[in-house]
Amino acid sequence: MSSTKDELQLYAKAIYNCAISNHQSLDHWKTMLQLMANILNNEIIKNLISKAYFSQHVISLFIDLCCNKVNQYGINLIKILAENKRLMLLEKLYKEFINLCELYQGVVNITVISAHKLNEEYISKINIMLKKRFFKKINVTYVIDESIIGGLIIKFCDTVINASIHSRLEKLLNILQY
């Protein structure tokens, strides 16, 4: 796991714990983080934050752009992220926070990648198998990627199950090279 992913998980968990311990709505935190990420997506703001002359004035501008929709805890988060030069991670932090909330609420997000569109019967079998595996509510997203040639890739949390033809061919190629 990369250090950025570790950092994101730590920040997300800290936000989650802050919300719970201060009796704050998780939905309010989702809204605040989404607002912050949306503001950061503005090219002018992004350029200001990424420049070497990033200052307290830029932090104040960023907070002002939140239009009083961010509480004191959110403002403190902005200051901490800015102090640690991590404001650019806000969009990823927002996504990580949502994943963490869903995980604590017993929801697992799963991505199933196939080379072609799957029929309803096959999708039903995959859903049943995944529900048995996780014993939780699951949200399954199906993605088509023709480059995998055939088979499936299943992604959830930090786990990837790669049962694609493409990966098998790569393994075979590596074996043959030695």
Curated annotation (Swiss-Prot):
InterPro entries: ATP_synth_OSCP/delta_N_sf, ATPase_OSCP/dsu
Disulfide bonds: none
UniProt-listed Pfam families: OSCP (PF00213)
Membrane topology: Peripheral membrane protein
This protein's UniProt keywords: ATP synthesis, Cell membrane, CF(1), Hydrogen ion transport, Ion transport, Membrane, Transport
GO MF, one annotated term: proton-transporting ATP synthase activity, rotational mechanism
Keyword Acyltransferase included in the entry's annotation: no
Annotated localization: Cell membrane
Ligase in keyword set: no
GO CC annotation terms, alphabetical: plasma membrane; proton-transporting ATP synthase complex
Primary location class: membrane
Origin superkingdom: Bacteria
Function: F(1)F(0) ATP synthase produces ATP from ADP in the presence of a proton or sodium gradient. F-type ATPases consist of two structural domains, F(1) containing the extramembraneous catalytic core and F(0) containing the membrane proton channel, linked together by a central stalk and a peripheral stalk. During catalysis, ATP synthesis in the catalytic domain of F(1) is coupled via a rotary mechanism of the central stalk subunits to proton translocation.
Family: Belongs to the ATPase delta chain family.
Self-association state and partner proteins as the record states: F-type ATPases have 2 components, F(1) - the catalytic core - and F(0) - the membrane proton channel. F(1) has five subunits: alpha(3), beta(3), gamma(1), delta(1), epsilon(1). F(0) has three main subunits: a(1), b(2) and c(10-14). The alpha and beta chains form an alternating ring which encloses part of the gamma chain. F(1) is attached to F(0) by a central stalk formed by the gamma and epsilon chains, while a peripheral stalk is formed by the delta and b chains.
Name of the protein in its database record: ATP synthase subunit delta
Organism annotation: Buchnera aphidicola subsp. Baizongia pistaciae (strain Bp)
